[in-house]
Regions:
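Nucleic-acid endo/exonuclease domains
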Residues: 1-102, 106-131
C-alpha cells in the first residue's frame, strides 16, 4: 500500500479547484486537529470534506469498488475495517458539531461532476449560512 498516496491525490485536487471556483477558498488541507484528519476542512465553520476513493472505502453499488480475486480474505477484512473506521470518524465528527461532506471519486468523473459541484455548493452554502 506504500504506493498509494494518503493526501494530495488527483480527486482531492479536483475538489480544491472546485471549491475555489465556487468562491469558497480558505480551507485547510489534511487538518490534523479533527477526527480522521479531513482531506479539506473549514475549522471555523466546522465543515469537514472527505474525498473518498471508491475502491478503498467501498462505495456501495459503484463499479469501481471491485474486490481483488487474489487474497480475498485479506481484502475483505481490510475493506471492512476501512468502512467501520469511516463510520466511526463520521459519528465522532458529527457528535462534535461538524458538518461532514463525503465526495466519492466516481462523482468527479466527467458525466457526474456538474451535479457533484452543485451538491457541494449547496452543502457548503448551507453550512456557511447556518453559522
Amino acid at each position: 500500500m506504500q504506493g498509494n498516496k494518503r493526501r494530495d491525490t488527483k480527486p482531492e485536487m479536483v475538489v480544491w479547484k472546485m471549491l475555489r471556483e465556487l468562491g469558497f477558498p480558505g480551507y485547510r488541507l489534511d487538518w490534523k486537529k479533527a477526527h480522521g484528519h479531513p482531506d479539506i476542512a473549514y475549522p471555523g465553520r466546522k465543515i469537514a470534506i472527505y474525498v473518498m476513493g471508491c475502491f478503498w472505502h467501498r462505495h456501495e453499488g459503484c463499479k469501481y469498488a471491485s474486490t481483488p480475486k487474489t487474497h480475498a480474505d485479506y481484502w475483505e477484512a481490510k475493506f471492512a475495517r476501512n468502512v467501520e473506521r469511516d463510520a466511526e470518524v463520521r459519528a465522532a465528527m458529527e457528535a462534535d458539531g461538524w458538518q461532514v461532506v463525503e465526495i466519492w471519486e466516481c462523482e468527479l468523473k466527467k458525466d457526474r461532476i456538474d451535479e457533484t459541484r452543485e451538491r457541494l455548493r449547496s452543502e457548503i452554502e448551507y453550512a456557511f449560512i447556518k453559522m
